[in-house]
């Protein structure tokens, strides 16, 4: 993605036409929807043009249908699609997923204003607006599990985004929307169309209000059959197309994941830390049966601290579209807000080293996300205020996840797997415990015992401390980050973290670590730290994190054709990384759209540490 990667929101004019307020793009000089009736045009061109009423109504149980769109705009097309889905969807576990791209997203205020026109869509508009993402580049997944509907909204330039998309599932239908080719020629470049076809398959359909030559030629180059039925309103024609013909040599069919079609899957998840819990939840939300195994008790490892802070280290804005921590932070906030265990907060991130680099982020990110303000605790260090953050109560989250009717917890020590036909047997000693369709191993460093050639995960000891501060409590909705962190654990106790000792796996609570945590807060907030009780009165918990050699989680299959996957190596950011990475894992296993770009998926790939076997060159003896 190019360096000018700061997302600019759309600049709009507004015009009343036949009593409807129509938004007009200043950037492109074109309307966002038809002046005749935008909703009726959407139904005529995109829904009918892709024969979606019949196709959606006939989806089989657990079938996954995806619709791609080239310009999100006001979201009108997606809302009309969602409304149709409500009307015709079969009473089974089929799922509808929409993928859309937008270079200039509307501000939330403008989106509310634009969608206010459509009374019949207001219940859906409200749900969309509640999850409408921050104006940051990259993929934003919006999930509506009760509707069996989801949206991947990619913010950025279509010329950069479509080549970066991973093809884990072919798109079934396309809305070729966006402003007219004469107003927005970049949208209709051959590179964009090539990648739209790459993400498709035989049987994929296409529809557009435009019959411009550049679009017709771009599709015909790949053997796609085009027809031109009557357009909407005053428009004589529209484009309707289906991919029937053999593909050209330039764009060969890209293979997709081995999908498990149209049946409920039984998934075994080994390990009930945050990696295992989030993975179990992701499968269960899709209607699959999950058996979650834990050797002792859920959250007995590094995930079991009294509190987890969602505290991202932000990157320069031009890297945000493929930066795991930034993308995970946005996804995690949307994920955890569905649980009572989540508490929205703001975080004062103190600038200790390279202070100007941190302060510069406040100028790069939207002002309502990151700002510079005076710290509420006296300190000599400058800081930025991250207004979109959160804290999670791990044990409350565990209880909520385990209440899911499709998740069963079993206490057992799984020691081996036996694969046969399309199943995997899980064994505890010599006894078969379960047969599953797929297994996901989430056992941190102990995952290595269940695989050959597993990457070496480094142990990192960490201890959190908590202490009575009822005499000087901090705001409940605020945390402080300074190399360590502190915030209210409850109304009378302060939690502080965390020590960080690589290559140590001891888990005893130590006074030295309390001293370490005290020295961290004292170095930044000395006046406040002096009020705290002596460290001998502190309580704590020590645990061991698992860290991969390159600091990225290990996600996916260790062998290409295997039904056994892994998810481990989350380090100290487990609660931040887990929700997004579990969606990536599920996409690979079930054959769904992947919510991260190729570049990031390669960094997560569980096979990335395996040595590549180089073919031997033939040896020729000289004569």
From Swiss-Prot:
Its cofactor is FAD. It is found in: Cytoplasm. It holds the Pfam family DAO. Residues 1-244 are annotated as: tRNA (mnm(5)s(2)U34)-methyltransferase. Residues 270-623 are annotated as: FAD-dependent cmnm(5)s(2)U34 oxidoreductase. GO terms for cellular component: cytoplasm. Keywords: Cytoplasm, FAD, Flavoprotein, Methyltransferase, Multifunctional enzyme, Oxidoreductase, S-adenosyl-L-methionine, Transferase, tRNA processing. It catalyses: 5-aminomethyl-2-thiouridine(34) in tRNA + S-adenosyl-L-methionine = 5-methylaminomethyl-2-thiouridine(34) in tRNA + S-adenosyl-L-homocysteine + H(+). InterPro entries: FAD-dep_OxRdtase, FAD/NAD-bd_sf, MnmC-like_methylTransf, SAM-dependent_MTases_sf, tRNA_MAMT_biosynth_bifunc_MnmC, tRNA_MNMC2, tRNA_S-uridine_synth_MnmC_C. SUPFAM superfamilies: FAD-linked reductases, C-terminal domain, Nucleotide-binding domain. In the N-terminal section; belongs to the methyltransferase superfamily. tRNA (mnm(5)s(2)U34)-methyltransferase family. In the C-terminal section; belongs to the DAO family. This is tRNA 5-methylaminomethyl-2-thiouridine biosynthesis bifunctional protein MnmC. It comes from Acinetobacter baumannii (strain ATCC 17978 / DSM 105126 / CIP 53.77 / LMG 1025 / NCDC KC755 / 5377). The gene is mnmC.
